[in-house]
Design a protein with these regions (language model features):
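Short, acidic, metal-binding catalytic loop of nucleotide-sugar glycosyltransferases
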Residues: 24-33
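Glycine-rich, basic loop-to-helix element that forms the pyrophosphate-binding segment
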Residues: 66-83
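A conserved acidic beta->alpha catalytic loop
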Residues: 25, 39-49, 68, 98
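Acidic donor-binding loop at a coil-to-helix junction in glycosyltransferase catalytic cores
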Residues: 174-184
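Catalytic donor-sugar/metal-binding loop of nucleotide-sugar-dependent glycosyltransferases
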Residues: 186-203
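Conserved donor NDP-sugar-binding/catalytic core segment of glycosyltransferases
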Residues: 105-134
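Acidic donor-binding/catalytic loop of UDP-sugar-dependent glycosyltransferases
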Residues: 45, 98-111
Length: 271
């Protein structure tokens, strides 16, 4: 069976302690196309380490460095743009402090191969070393469902659909508060087929105190709301999602037109 290949983008910022683990988990995937490491102007040895890894696997890994720290959304988007020059039709995003389980990309490739109308695949997201206050909460499974549907590190896109969405939103709002992956993730579920593979192999999500997911879990499980997330900013984020949806629907309208080809038109003007 000739399953499709999948390019992988890993955004990196001060991740020298975990990058090797993430990269090794990607390289063991049978359906890997090419791996792009995008250093977001790290201040530690991440970039040097990435170059070392690329030197070991020159045909499988490419490294780029952002000219300044631009945030994870921009780093992901830049990696996807670089991957666009390959013949591979799909791109996955993995965080530098997480890791794929063996066979993770294969289950995504199988899905795209047999379910050709799939635009997005969501891999299983498995928390490792999650604090007991979350893991033992009676509503944890429900809260984690939201996490794995909005996280940026367990998602695989049809590249054409990803670019049609405009990539991950890079608005200043998300630089301040995070959530760009959520804004895009919600838009995908409103405009396209999103296949979830939550009962299969996927992504090991290594947890730590202070991680971004804590804010989400604190809100969902304990009702703790970040005072920085105001109603106005929530409305702004929702508007970003709405804009992505509007653009996709407009694109569908054009692509589904029965009038394919050159159609000479004349504009009539009235006084």
């Amino acid at each position: 069976m000739n399953l499709p290949l999948i390019d992988v983008v890993i955004p990196c910022y001060n991740t020298e302690q975990t990058l090797v683990r993430a990269v090794e988990s990607v390289l063991q995937q049978n359906n890997l196309g090419h791996l792009w490491l995008i250093d977001d102007a790290s201040t530690d040895n991440t970039f040097a380490l990435a170059l070392q890894l690329a030197a070991q696997y020159p045909n499988r890994i490419s490294v780029e460095q952002m000219p300044k720290n631009c945030g994870v959304a921009m780093a992901r988007n830049w990696g996807a743009m670089l991957s666009a020059k390959s013949a591979v039709d799909f791109v996955a995003f993995l965080d530098a402090d997480d890791a794929y389980e063996p066979g993770a990309l294969e289950v995504a490739a199988v899905t795209f191969h047999f379910q050709t109308d799939t635009s997005v695949v969501r891999l299983a997201l498995k928390p490792i070393n999650l604090a007991q206050r979350y893991a033992e909460h009676p509503n944890f499974d429900q809260a984690w469902q939201y996490m794995r549907m909005t996280c940026g590190g367990n998602i695989v896109f049809n590249k054409a659909f990803f670019f049609a969405c405009g990539g991950f939103p890079t608005h200043q709002l998300f630089r301040e508060l995070g959530g760009e992956d959520g804004a895009l993730g919600i838009a995908t579920t409103k405009t396209a087929k999103v296949a979830t593979l939550f009962e299969d192999v996927g992504v090991l999500h290594f947890c730590r105190e202070g991680m971004h997911a804590e804010r989400l879990l604190d809100g969902l499980l304990f009702g703790k709301q970040d005072p920085a997330i105001t109603a106005e900013k929530m409305a702004e984020a929702e508007q970003v999602t709405s804009t992505i949806c509007r653009r996709i629907e407009a694109l569908k309208c054009g692509l589904n037109s029965a009038e394919i080809g050159i159609r000479p038109l004349v504009v009539e003007r009235t006084e």
